[in-house]
Amino acid sequence: MQVFWFIPTHGDSRYLGTAEGARQVDHTYLQQVAVAADTLGYEGVLIPTGRSCEDPWVVAASLIPVTKRLRFLVAVRPGLMAPTLAARMAATYDRLSNGRLLVNLVTGGDPAELAGDGLFLDHAQRYEASEEFIRIWRETLAASHEGAALDYTGKHLSVKGAKVLYPPVQRPHPPVYFGGSSEAAHELAAEQVDSYLTWGEPPAAVAEKIADVRARAAKHGRTVRFGIRLHVIVRETEDEAWAAADKLISKLDDDTVARAQEAFRKMDSAGQQRMAALHANGVKRTRADLEISPNLWAGVGLVRGGAGTALVGDPQTVAARMKEYADLGIDTFVLSGYPHLEEAYRFAELVFPLLPRSVRDKLPGNVLNGPFGEVIATGIVPRVAAS
């Protein structure tokens, strides 16, 4: 099991859908979140992309010198740059970070945003172009280790003599992650990517996705790993966790939810449509309605695009729910919480000790419990209380 955190380049807050409690997200703050994730033992961080975010590659590059072991899951967007340019950027980043790059292929699902970026392909065409893009990207980087060039002719993209002179550290290329819920997305994942990511849906729905992608990959003679993108709201007790979930959306008003849902309806992303269906396009507003599966809460998706669900509960329950997903085949958990700095600490302190040994064995020594807390009086070293 791998556990990643999230760099909030689109903003951070204590509440959703309001400026109240908003936090200044500048470079100093992004560094704080990255250093916390690195220090606490998260294996990587996702850096999002889109017009609502700071540029992921610039942000990721700026975080190399302040981290030691943290890996960076950075987006590439087919259509915004040539695949060979993306390959050179990836190779350079991988070399400068000593092999810490992971690449997230993002096709895009908002026609308005895509049009603003000069992309006027429909859903099917975007996936065709994305398949050609990542094929050129992968094969160019693989060839770079031998000093070879690539010729490729496709429907949307073609290259002749494509070459990367300075190969990446990782062979044949940095691992490729990708998420999508349509049939076209599943086929692309099966044929081209290393890890398929799903947003946090109920376990039965996730199991169906895994089975479909796995079967498609087998037809291509490939195996694919699986990951899930979730928010987390964990507290020492269940009641405290659910109170925190209620507080997160306590400043929302009907107009804000309606405007968000209207924006989501204009998207042609199958994944976004599935997220919206979990809360009935904003109609569901009570805890009973929003808890769509035990401890899986759809409240975040009332106003947040993309990943819209959170695991809510005490440490033991959240760890148990993660195990349920792991038993389905999920091996990478990409997590986040509001605000991202404090919640990185809270999740690590409360849940990491309960996760499988494969996670605990990779944690930096004594980072979560010691060697001791604040000294009592002037010289008494505190001890761990008996359970």
Curated annotation (Swiss-Prot):
GO BP field: alkanesulfonate catabolic process
InterPro entries with a match to the protein in the record: Alkanesulphonate_mOase_FMN-dep, Luciferase-like_dom, Luciferase-like_sf, SsuD_RutA_monooxygenase
GO MF, one example: alkanesulfonate monooxygenase activity
EC number: 1.14.14.5
Source superkingdom: Bacteria
Pfam families (alphabetical): Bac_luciferase
Keyword field: Flavoprotein, FMN, Monooxygenase, Oxidoreductase
Enzyme class: oxidoreductase
Disulphide bonds in the chain: none
Chemical reaction(s) catalysed: an alkanesulfonate + FMNH2 + O2 = an aldehyde + FMN + sulfite + H2O + 2 H(+)
Chain's role: Catalyzes the desulfonation of aliphatic sulfonates.
Family in the record: Belongs to the SsuD family.
Record-linked PANTHER family: ALKANESULFONATE MONOOXYGENASE, ALKANESULFONATE MONOOXYGENASE-RELATED
Annotated protein name in UniProt: Alkanesulfonate monooxygenase
Lineage of the species this protein comes from: Bacteria, Pseudomonadati, Pseudomonadota, Betaproteobacteria, Burkholderiales
